[in-house]
């Protein structure tokens, strides 16, 4: 499933994806995608048990809800927890590695009556959002399974 995302440490970029999706970042859940386990520990508090669980299951389709660190953007400092992901998708993880920063992400905006197919097809995503986002990355047809929250 495709998502909308931005540089995870740039406040204006985060505000922009929230405007596109019409959500309030202080009230709605956004997740951060990290490149590897060591980068996860920069943005979330990871104890030994959680580390072992993450090491066994990541990269993979999981979102871990963890206590955040003070390295998160100001928008999230009033929140105790943050959703952390390290998906089994080399494209997005490589972008995070090259940026040396997490990717802030949320599901694509959609209406309840819409076919979810557009969330899996980069060409359909480009038709719908190409004028309001900077870039649509074509990683091929995706699945529609959301991540499991841990």
Predicted features by range, described:
Residues 1-150:
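Active-site-adjacent structural elements in enzyme catalytic cores
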